[in-house]
Regions:
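Conserved class I S-adenosyl-L-methionine
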Residues: 1-39, 41-50
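Class I SAM-dependent methyltransferase SAM/SAH-binding core
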Residues: 51-96
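A short acidic, Gly/Pro-enriched loop at the edge of an enzyme's catalytic core
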Residues: 97-105
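A short SAM/SAH-binding and catalytic strip from SAM-dependent methyltransferases
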Residues: 104-120
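A short glycine-rich, Lys/Arg-flanked "PGG" loop and its adjoining helix->strand segment in the class I
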Residues: 123-135
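SAM-dependent methyltransferase
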Residues: 140-211
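C-terminal lobe and adjacent flexible extensions of AdoMet/dcAdoMet transferase-like proteins
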Residues: 203-249
Length: 249
């Protein structure tokens, strides 16, 4: 693994194209709508800002956005886009990297919390966010629900994407809550492979992490359109809130 983590220049150069469906306005707009509402005129902090899929349209809606990003290559792609140079980006691990000021809302989308591959790092992330939030501020995470029940009995690998030129497999290690995503893509007639490790966490575990950081669960939905979260939900959008200042009489 290089300084840019698993998202080096080779990956960054094709990221937007490979995740094109995630840039569709039908996917992006509900995310931005909710974040604008939660920002309430304040600032937003994106952890794992990437190439700006959410940050750019959020900034276009008038919300001042700052980001943290481990990959310099991904951040360079953001800065090269219209409006990207107006968004401040701190390069570093979002579990520990700090930025100036406080924020009304901080957010992690598209399973990015799983990029932190230990429970210690995930707890540190919650605490880092809490330190950056204003009193009454919110932390939003979008992440998939672990799909262990969809694994065939005795199996540890499940396909998550299959097309003519790209396919992907998730490999689970239940004992460690580890998940490695194996991506295969045909490029110029050759098969390229990228394997990225993750750590999955159940919603209840994330709630406990928030509690350790002094935040409480405010909302949990099955998606950005505020669908109910049920036993059949494949992902959740959760909002934890930092306590507002207590006035002294």
């Amino acid at each position: 693994m290089q300084d840019d983590g698993y998202f080096d220049e080779r990956v960054a150069a094709r990221y937007d194209e490979s995740a094109a469906e995630m840039f569709d306005p039908a996917v992006v707009d509900p995310v931005v709508d909710l974040l604008v509402e939660l920002a309430g005129g304040g600032r937003a902090l994106e952890l794992g800002i990437g190439t700006g899929r959410i940050a750019l349209p959020l900034a276009q809606r008038g919300v001042p956005v700052h980001g943290i990003e481990l990959s310099k290559a991904m951040a360079s792609r953001l800065r090269a886009k219209p409006g990207g140079d107006a968004i401040g980006v701190a390069i570093g691990d979002f579990a520990t990297t700090t930025v100036d000021g406080t924020f009304s809302v901080a957010y992690l989308v598209f399973n990015t919390i799983m990029n932190l591959t230990t429970q210690v790092a995930q707890v540190a992330c919650f605490r880092n966010v809490a330190a950056h939030l204003e009193p009454g501020g919110c932390f939003v995470i979008e992440v998939g629900v672990p799909e262990l029940r969809r694994l065939p009995p005795g199996e540890t690998i499940r396909a998550f994407h299959v097309s003519e030129t790209r396919w992907g497999l998730d490999e689970y290690d239940v004992a460690s809550q580890g998940l490695t995503s194996h991506h295969f893509e045909i490029v110029d007639g050759r098969v390229e492979r990228l394997s990225v490790p993750f750590r999955y966490a159940w919603p209840a575990e994330l709630d406990l992490m928030a509690q350790l950081a002094g935040m409480t669960l405010r909302e949990r939905w099955g998606g950005w359109r505020r669908e109910p979260f049920t036993s059949d939900s494949r992902k959740h959008v959760s909002i934890w809130e930092k306590p507002a200042s207590v006035s002294r009489g």
